[in-house]
Every structure is written in C-alpha cells, then in structure tokens.
C-alpha cells in the first residue's frame, strides 16, 4: 500500500469534514470553508476524528491517486486551521511594491508599472516596500499567485535583482572579466 495514502488524517477540534456523492469533500474550520471534488475511484470515510482514504485495487494509477487524495484532504484541513503563506522579497534599485485595496502595483524596471489583482480567497500584505506576504486557506491558490508575482521579474544570476521567495537561494554567476 501507499505509505502516505494509508496514514489517517487527524481532524482537529472545530473542524468538520463532510463527504458527499462523487467524492465532493467539504472541510469547514475557523478560517473558512474549502470544498473540492476528488477522484471518484477512491473510498473516503470519516471515522470519528480521522479521515481514512482507501483504494479499490493495486493498479499503478490507483496507487498514485491514493497518496494524492490523502494529501489534498490533509492540505484542506491544514488550510482551514492555520492557513498558508508565502513570503516574497524584491531586490533591485528602484524595484518596489505598493498596495491599493485589492490591487498590487509592482515597479520592476519596466516602462510601466505591473498591476495585479488579488484572486478570490488570497490576500497580499506588504511589509515595507520590498516584502510581500501572500496568505490564504487554499494551498494551491497561494502557491499559484506567489509564482505569478515572482514570474513578473525572476531573480537574475549576476546581481540577484528581481523577485524571489524568502527561503530561495539564488545561484550567483561571476561576470565577464575585463581586458588587462
């Protein structure tokens, strides 16, 4: 059996998990509600304060879906209890971010400012002009929006200018050597 898939998911106090037909899982918690349709082949059962995912047979596809389904439910439970966040840092002369309502305006050395709208269920918080925190209860949406912000100006290897994750390490390169 899948090692991740067979681990039961603990449901903390204050969180409810409901499984409707066609494996539509709804997780309600202190931070909000998440719902998602999971693969119909998997058997999802709520047993007391745990959720158990089982698979019908040993086909490779079923083994893959087993671990995936369990992890998606675990991420939903974590999201409604503690939430997710990603921290981005902006490096570079004149590079900065500004927030106006739900709009994030990035000045990244282009001839125009880059304006991004926060998606539903995700919020951005600015700490100073060069630190952006993306927060939300849906892990996928938080990661996707953080990646979209980073893609507006990826860090370059010579000076490290651009937008990077706070825990990301940029491999630096040595520039050209001048003539002697």
From Swiss-Prot:
- One GO CC term, this protein: cytosolic large ribosomal subunit
Task: Provide an example Pfam family for this protein.
Answer: Ribosomal_L6
Keyword field: Ribonucleoprotein, Ribosomal protein, RNA-binding, rRNA-binding
Give the Gene3D superfamilies listed for this entry: Ribosomal protein L6, alpha-beta domain (3.90.930.12)
What's the superkingdom here? Bacteria
Biological process GO terms, please?
Answer: cytoplasmic translation
Q: Which InterPro entries match?
A: Ribosomal_uL6-like (IPR000702), Ribosomal_uL6-like_a/b-dom_sf (IPR036789), Ribosomal_uL6_a/b-dom (IPR020040), Ribosomal_uL6_bac-type (IPR019906), Ribosomal_uL6_CS (IPR002358)
Q: Name one GO molecular function term.
A: rRNA binding
Q: How does it assemble?
A: Part of the 50S ribosomal subunit.
List, alphabetically, the HAMAP family matched.
Ribosomal_uL6_B
Concerning its family, UniProt says: Belongs to the universal ribosomal protein uL6 family.
Q: What does this protein do?
A: This protein binds to the 23S rRNA, and is important in its secondary structure. It is located near the subunit interface in the base of the L7/L12 stalk, and near the tRNA binding site of the peptidyltransferase center.
Protein name, per record: Large ribosomal subunit protein uL6
This protein's gene is called rplF
């Amino acid at each position: 059996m899948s090692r991740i898939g067979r681990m039961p998911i603990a449901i903390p106090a204050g969180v409810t998990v409901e499984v409707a037909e066609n494996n539509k899982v709804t997780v309600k918690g202190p931070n909000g509600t998440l719902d998602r349709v999971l693969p119909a082949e998997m058997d999802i059962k709520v047993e007391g304060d745990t959720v158990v995912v089982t698979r019908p047979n040993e086909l490779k596809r079923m083994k893959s879906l087993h671990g995936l389904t369990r992890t998606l439910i675990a991420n939903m439970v974590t999201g409604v209890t503690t939430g997710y966040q990603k921290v981005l840092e902006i490096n570079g002369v004149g590079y900065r971010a500004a927030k106006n309502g739900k709009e994030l305006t990035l000045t990244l050395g282009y001839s125009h400012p880059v304006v991004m709208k926060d998606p539903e269920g995700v919020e951005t918080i600015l700490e100073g002009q060069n630190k952006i925190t993306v927060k939300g209860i849906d892990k996928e949406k938080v990661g996707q929006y953080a990646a979209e912000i980073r893609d507006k100006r990826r860090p370059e290897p010579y000076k490290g200018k651009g937008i990077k994750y706070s825990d990301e390490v940029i491999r630096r390169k040595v520039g050209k050597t001048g003539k002697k």
